[in-house]
Amino acid sequence: MKITRTARFKKAWQELTQEEKALGRKALRNLATDVRYPALRAKKMQGTEHIWEARVSRSLRMTFEIAGNTIILRNIGRHDETLEQP
């Protein structure tokens, strides 16, 4: 699948530590291979129709949408902060 990033995702990415970015890159590789990759625990967010959340690490989450053959990355960061503003 093709992956694109929103401006908000790009900004949030810059705020991550190097260690968090490494975990994020691994999660993105898994996401591009298979949205249902078990470690991601990807699921649709409650109260939204098209937004998904996935686990990057124990404390990090990312949100995304799927449009055809494209994954649109929306946000990444701390669990609560990211899921409050998907």
What are these regions (language model features)?
Residues R29-A54, L83:
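A short, surface-exposed loop/turn module that caps and links secondary-structure elements
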Residues M1, W13-E15, A32-D34:
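Short hydrophobic/aromatic-rich motifs at helix boundaries and adjacent loops
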